[in-house]
Structures are given as structure tokens and as C-alpha cells.
């Protein structure tokens, strides 16, 4: 992480890059 673009499914965020 870090802080940046959210990634994961459209229903919920998995984490941040």
C-alpha cells in the first residue's frame, strides 16, 4: 500500500496500491 488506485471487484474494494 500505499496510497493510490483502489483495486478489486466492482462490489467492493480489495486493497490499495
Curated annotation (Swiss-Prot):
The lineage of its organism: Bacteria, Pseudomonadati, Pseudomonadota, Gammaproteobacteria, Pseudomonadales. The keyword Metal-binding does not apply. Keywords: Electron transport, Flavoprotein, FMN, Transport. Its cofactor is FMN. Residues 3-17 form the Flavodoxin-like domain. Low-potential electron donor to a number of redox enzymes. This is Flavodoxin A. Belongs to the flavodoxin family.
